[in-house]
Swiss-Prot record:
Post-translational changes noted in the entry: Binds 1 heme c group covalently per subunit.
Name this protein carries in UniProt: Cytochrome c6
Species name: Gloeothece citriformis (strain PCC 7424)
Chain's gene name: petJ
Keyword match Cytoplasm: no
HAMAP family named in the record: Cytc_PetJ
Subunit record text: Monomer.
Keyword 4Fe-4S included in the entry's annotation: no
Localization per Swiss-Prot or TrEMBL: Cellular thylakoid lumen
Signal peptide: 1-25
Transmembrane segments: none
Function comment: Functions as an electron carrier between membrane-bound cytochrome b6-f and photosystem I in oxygenic photosynthesis.
Primary site of residence: other
An individual GO BP term: photosynthesis
């Protein structure tokens, strides 16, 4: 009986952890600095001066399947359309940090 109770408690604990949202991997504080130095010209305040319909707001990131750390890292690294690639200008850690920053700001509404 004791073993059964222990197993049930362990299962509940593990199940509870599965509902916790994952933390972003990068350093948003450093990402803010990277964003200011490299992204602000086009994306000040989460906007987009090239294509006003594709902002960094949560709703637009969701609409274009970009509300995802890996998707943002890929676009920052490789560029897309009018957005230049930053893969040779930024380190992988800087790209991770700026992607984390963008996601955190999008979640908070810029």
């Amino acid at each position: 009986m004791k073993k059964l109770v222990s197993s049930v408690i362990l299962a509940l604990i593990l199940f509870g952890f599965s509902w916790v949202s994952p933390a972003f991997a990068g350093d948003a504080g450093n990402g803010s600095k990277v964003f200011s130095a490299n992204c602000n010209a086009c994306h000040l305040g989460g906007k987009n001066v090239v294509n006003a319909a594709k902002t960094l707001n949560k709703s637009d990131l969701e609409k274009y399947a970009m509300l995802d750390l890996e998707a943002i890292k890929t676009q920052v690294t490789n560029g897309k359309g009018a957005m230049p690639a930053f893969g040779k200008r930024l380190t992988p850690d800087q790209i991770e940090d700026v992607a984390t920053y963008v996601l955190e700001k999008a979640e908070k509404g810029w």
